[in-house]
Amino acid sequence: MDSNTVSSFQDILVRMSKMQLESSSGDLNGMITQFESLKLYRDLLGEAVMRMGDLHLLQSRNGKWREQLSQKFEEIRWLIEEVRHKLKTTESSFEQITFMQALQLLLEVEQEIRTFSFQLI
């Protein structure tokens, strides 16, 4: 796992949490939760790739892992759309920078998950 990606996730989550304090947006809270969930999933998938023997354990423990993978891509697409919408509607430069970084991170994570999943398939 790339340490820059980890710090990027942490930075964006902290920034979004600060925005949450300023506005009582339930949508933003949901986005933060989705980001945290996505980070955990990406980390677990990356660890499984590092230990290729875990592929069989992963498949036997959860026969629906491809379905889960598909669901995660749906979540990523949803988050990308939400972030794009927030970018269009916000006027705060702090929020714009945060959402631009979040969008870039989502695209990077989507690519990482695709790479991991192809290695597992």
Swiss-Prot record:
Q: Give the quaternary structure.
A: Interacts with protein M1. May interact with host nucleoporin RAB/HRB and exportin XPO1/CRM1.
What is the name of the protein in this document? Nuclear export protein
Functionally, this protein is described as follows:
Mediates the nuclear export of encapsidated genomic RNAs (ribonucleoproteins, RNPs). Acts as an adapter between viral RNPs complexes and the nuclear export machinery of the cell. Possesses no intrinsic RNA-binding activity, but includes a C-terminal M1-binding domain. This domain is believed to allow recognition of RNPs bound to the protein M1.
Does Transport show up as a keyword for this record?
yes
Which gene specifies this protein's sequence?
Answer: NS
Q: What else is known?
A: Average number present in a viral particle is estimated to be 130-200 molecules.
Which cell locations does it reside in?
A: Virion; Host nucleus
Q: At the top level of its lineage, which domain of life is listed?
A: Viruses
Give the UniProt record's GO annotations in the biological process aspect: exit of virus from host cell nucleus through nuclear pore
The record places the motif (Nuclear export signal) at 12-21, 85-94
Keyword Transport in record: yes
Q: Which GO cellular component terms are attached?
A: host cell nucleus; virion component
Concerning InterPro entries, the annotation shows: Flu_NS2 (IPR000968)
Q: What is its main location?
A: virion
Q: Which UniProt keywords apply?
A: Host nucleus, Host-virus interaction, Transport, Virion
What the record says about family reads: Belongs to the influenza viruses NEP family.
